[in-house]
Each structure stands twice: as structure tokens, then as C-alpha cells.
């Protein structure tokens, strides 16, 4: 599956993605898309506790809207970036160059405008996860019943 690590995928949990989106229809669509592609999808329910939800869930990646209740996605990005390097993908109806520039300057890793192309969204998610977590995946190789730990050279 797209969301699982290649080596020993059957023994590893899929990547967890936190959705920070206040539109329930879009939130539901994202959850369905992600789960259908092998990811674990978790959505923020209480927008006054986004940072707490992030800390509790420990996601591998965040999908973040800009226009949210209580505070902007830009503010949330800054708060999360101050405590974590988790990849952040802005998925938003805000489509100006300034919006995209702000997202980059505040630590966002990708910027996708709504309505989004699901194939492009999934490709960006996969690319970010591969880049950020590649070293974790490559430390252990599994073939049939044999497991090689690269760091220690132990089988």
C-alpha cells in the first residue's frame, strides 16, 4: 500500500496523517482518500486544542488549512514548527502568491490549492514521507524470513 513502508510492510503500521480542516465534507473526503491508500487518518475535532491534538497523536505528516476557527493555519504552522519538524502540507482555498510564500516562510513543506487533484495530493504526501522517513525505513531490510539490521550488520 502507498502509505506503508516497503520493507516488512506487513509488520509495520501505516503512516499517521493529521488533518486540520474545519469543513466536515472536505475533512471526510480526505479521511476516506487517505485510509483508502493505506494511511491512518486522524482529524482535529476541537480547534481550540490543535497543538494538544498534535502532541497526543504524534502524526508523521499534517494536512493544514489556512482559514480555521480560533486561529489561522499560519499560526498553527508556526506553533508546530517550533516543537517539531513534521512535514506540513497546506491544503487551502487561499490561492495568492503571498499565501504560498507565507506558508513556505513559516515552515510549510508543500502548498496545494482547493479544489485539489487527489493524485497530486497523494504524490506529494508520499514524496515527503519518503524523504523524511527514508533513513528509518532503510535501517532494516526484510526478505522472506530474514531481517538484516544495516546499522549493526546483524541478521
Report the location of each language-model feature.
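Short, Lys/Arg-enriched segments at the junction into DNA-binding effector domains
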Residues: 15-16, 127-155
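N-terminal/domain-start alpha-helical segments
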Residues: 2-132
Amino acid at each position: 500500500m502507498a502509505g506503508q513502508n516497503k520493507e516488512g510492510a506487513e509488520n509495520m503500521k501505516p503512516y499517521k496523517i493529521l488533518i486540520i480542516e474545519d469543513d466536515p465534507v472536505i475533512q471526510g473526503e480526505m479521511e476516506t482518500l487517505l485510509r483508502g491508500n493505506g494511511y491512518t487518518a486522524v482529524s482535529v475535532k476541537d480547534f481550540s486544542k490543535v497543538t494538544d491534538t498534535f502532541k497526543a497523536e504524534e502524526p508523521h505528516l499534517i494536512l493544514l488549512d489556512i482559514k480555521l476557527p480560533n486561529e489561522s493555519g499560519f499560526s498553527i504552522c508556526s506553533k508546530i514548527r517550533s516543537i517539531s519538524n513534521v512535514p506540513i502540507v497546506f491544503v487551502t482555498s487561499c490561492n495568492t502568491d503571498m499565501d504560498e510564500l507565507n506558508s513556505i516562510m513559516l515552515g510549510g513543506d508543500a502548498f496545494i490549492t482547493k479544489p485539489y487533484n487527489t493524485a497530486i495530493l497523494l504524490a506529494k504526501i508520499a514524496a515527503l514521507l519518503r524523504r523524511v522517513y527514508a533513513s528509518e525505513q532503510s535501517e532494516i531490510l526484510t526478505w522472506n524470513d530474514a531481517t538484516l539490521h544495516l546499522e549493526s550488520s546483524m541478521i
